[in-house]
Amino acid sequence: MATGAANVESPQSLPLRLLGRVALVTGGSSGIGESIVLLFRKHGAKVCIADVQDNQGQRLCETLGGSSDIAFCHCDVTIEDDVKRAVDFTVDKFGTLDIMVNNAGVSGPPCPDIRDFELSAFDRVFDINVRGVFIGMKHAARIMIPAKKGSIISISSVASTMGGLGPHAYTGSKHAVLGLTKNVAAELGKHGIRVNCVSPYAVATSLALAHLPEAERTEDTWDDFRRFVADNANLQGVELTMEDVANAVVFLASDEARYVSGMNLMVDGGFTSTNHALQVFRP
């Protein structure tokens, strides 16, 4: 007698959701960007990694077997010529650009007192997190508009929708990424181009460690961070991973999201939908 389980596809038989697509991932050499690159390749995409971390980018290409479907290009997202060159390199190598992932970002130095915040540090965060995203959108659009299709995805944060989760520059920059996402989606919709962003809750990466309060730190900062994040999470019993964020990006890049644009996809376990101060449902 047949059962429902007999109709469930094994992981090996699941469709490659990005087969034949060409993607460019900024900040793709490490952290969330690396996870996105790995999952894109798993789903059949050809990928160009754009990063300032040359050694790590080359290492990742070698990890993926040195395939002709993976490439690295040095790119500082604050320099428009670098981004233009990375986009053109991708098109020259793979023939087109279907997916642009603006992942490169920094959190900036912790600074609990606005009176002490150095403007040079503020400017650096905005240069990378906002200017870099805008330049990526601009040059992706340059290729995608004539093709009348494409998907632009930017990595934002839960700090895109609420305050008190990070330094002023970081929070302001992530609000700006959300604003750019909505506005660019409004312009590019007529060209068949989708523009979205992904806003995860805290993930254990070197970038995120800067957000851990000094009072919560011991000798093992990674464990401290994971414990702090778990204690403040809304969804319990599940730890957010870089792969979870990458899965959200794959969804937005795929045809499964073909009518999704202007969206801020929250990968936060309901964190931003909860008033943590009231704690109405806490025992």
From Swiss-Prot:
One of its GO terms (cellular component) is cytosol. GO terms for biological process: (+)-camphor biosynthetic process; abscisic acid biosynthetic process. The keyword Protein transport does not apply. NAD(+) binds at residues 27-33, 51, 76-77, 103-105, 170, 174, 205. Keywords: NAD, Oxidoreductase. The active site is at residues 157, 170, 174. It holds the Pfam family adh_short_C2. Its EC number is 1.1.1.198. One of its GO terms (molecular function) is (+)-borneol dehydrogenase activity. It catalyses: (1R,2S,4R)-borneol + NAD(+) = (1R,4R)-camphor + NADH + H(+). Belongs to the short-chain dehydrogenases/reductases (SDR) family. Involved in the biosynthesis of monoterpene natural products related to camphor. Catalayzes the oxidation of (+)-borneol to (+)-camphor. Shows absolute selectivity towards (+)-borneol. Catalyzes the oxidation of (+)-isoborneol to (-)-camphor. Shows absolute selectivity towards (+)-isoborneol. This is (+)-borneol dehydrogenase 2.
